[in-house]
Amino acid sequence: WGGLTAKLHGDPGVPMISCSIFDQSYTRALCDLGSSINIMPKVIFEQLQYPALSQTRMFVQLADSTVRHPEGIVENIYVRIRNCFVLADFVVLNMDGDLGLDLILGRPFLNSVKARIDVGSR
């Protein structure tokens, strides 16, 4: 049925936005209603040269069911979307390869910006 639905209505694609952290711009930030956390790949954390990374004992289960132990948590990072600045915490994960995205913005972030995701329009 999924293929038929996509043919009838069209695939709305993946909800991505552009944002900035410090002087770095990211064009592939995934708005993920299925994620209860915000995720930042370790390579991006290292590019930011942010000094503080809090240790954590949590484990993260990814969409492919693999379980990872994060490098840590970076707290109170200002994320800029257009002219708005939003404080966010990110779980920093060592990710394998290029995922095709820069950040994962989960429900906590989407809630704080009062995001509305409309997959019915393009």
Regions picked out by a protein language model, each given a short descriptive name:
Residues 1-122:
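Proline- and glycine-rich low-complexity segments
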